[in-house]
Amino acid sequence: LVENPGNDVLYFLSFLSLSIIDENNILGVVMKDTFLRNLVCLCTVFFLLPTHISLAEVDIIKDVLQTIDFTKEMCVVSEEAIQKTYGDDPFRLPFFNDQLRNPLETPSILKNNIDYCIANRDSIRNVHWYTSYRLGYMVAAYPQYEPTFDHRIVESAPLLYAISDIYTLHQKPLSAYSFSLLQSKTKDIPVDVQKEIAKVLYASMEFELARDKAFATASELDLIKAFRNPAAILMEDGWDEITYQIASDANFGQLYFASIVLSHHLDAFLQILPSLAIPDSTSFSAETPMGSIQIHPAKDTLHTGRNILFSLDLGGNDTYLNSAGGNDSWFNPVSICINMTGDDTYEVQDPSVYSQGAGVFGFGALVDMQGDDHYKSIQYSQGFGCFGVGILWDQNGKDTYDCDNLAQGAGIFGIGILHDSAQSDTYHTYSFSQGFGYVKGFGLLMDDQGDDTYIANDEDVAGTNPQSSDHNTSFCQGAGFGRRADLAEGNSMSGGIGMLIDMQGNDTYSCGVFGQGTGYWAGTGVLYDQSGNDSYKGVWYVQGGAAHFGIAMLMDDQGNDTYDALLNMAQGAGHDVSLGYLIDREGNDTYTSPNLALGGGNSNGLGFFVDAQGDDIYQLRRTNATNLGKASCELFPKTSWRYG
């Protein structure tokens, strides 16, 4: 017994429970003679841990395990047993396997990754590099060795010759007459501005070449089909063989190397842009085989054009009814939209348009540098990547983000990033958003400051959730999701990485089923809130709850926080060889908890709940519940449930 420095309403310390299941010994535990051969579930609830000390360094965990002759080294999940049971899965991420081998190291592993993102949050290039690295691609490791394209710049007319080179690349060289017309259009743009834009254009050309090589084994017809329906393979009740084959054969490393280099040059352009002397009246437009290149004057502008390669708006309260940093076709592989100032509106009503920082078999980036902005779309937007990279980078302002699904930092076979730097923002969606990663995907949402509101709508219920028709399937706010097919044709695909990082402010989070740090089918989901008095409200598999080989963590460092979960498997809970963590490091917190919560493990699941400090209140929704460090088993699994 360890003395509690706080005045918790309920006192619990170091519970550990065992049950009898797991004929395949998937947990891979080495048993002593005094224990039964088949070990089942491990779940613990730890209080009184030193603040800001990683779990890997806390001796109390090791001490508790040793009371039953169970060491940290024995607490592993057998990759061989999983492979034997479910077959080989080429989509499983090394990042997932690292945590599978070291379940008790997971908080330290994830926190180190969070710290990297925070430290590099001002660099599009570095954040993008991190996401590709965690997907298993060690490329572009040293920025100083990345191509600069300086040798290709024609100092007297950089933009003119860069555009001419685009035509030459596509075997459509400009005629002398067209070259002369273009020359007259570019001459009034300051040369230093031309030079910086030209570097971005050369990086875009290199990206197109790399993109074509990355998908060289796929037929043009298959690529067009996959481009038109990027979510065809998302749901378990459907099967898209074309997308599966493209994903199996694609050279993602080559793709991401080129997109990181492009991000590097975009960073450089954004850094120098405020110092460039660009007249407010500057206006320019030119068509190219990769899309149009545009500069808009500092006034209120209505943007409706499509297939845009590069767009720079110098100011004004603008309205974008177009893709705004989303690539519109296979032949528009790169789309970059930069807005310098103004309170802007970005709105797309067509669900087939990739917009507001979306890259589908391409690279899409929207950068808004200042102003109170409004972003609205149906799907495939606001930092969405599918076989590509999509980035929305908002540097200042009180903003609102609204979408239905697959947005706000969502990646499926790709990378989606949304970063908002300042002020209080509102994020609204229904599903598969706000830090969502599907197979071979990484979705990241980062917010630096402000009292933010994150909503995964659970009031307008669609009635399609397999757990409860009264709630929506969310997979939002830090969710990793994979395709489970052991009950179907067998083509299971391990999930990706979903991460939401909020650094400051009193924030509010709400979702339905699966959210707020959740993982499913070898997916990893993380929600990290650094400071503020925050509120978390969810339904099922939330707040560090995972199912079916998933990994989930919700970590809150500071503040007096409120956690409310309605149904099973929440607040540091793992089901079916899953790992769930809820870690609150400081503050006087309130927990309202269902069954199998606050350190709950079921069917070989591992659940950990850690409250390090403060005067806390624990309210249980039912008596005799399997929570607060208890484990259980399912003798008769409900196999008709798709998600748990």
Give the positions of each predicted feature.
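Bacterial N-terminal signal peptides
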Residues: C41-T51
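Acidic/polar low-complexity surface segments
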Residues: S352-G357, G435-F436, I455-N491, G517-T518, ...
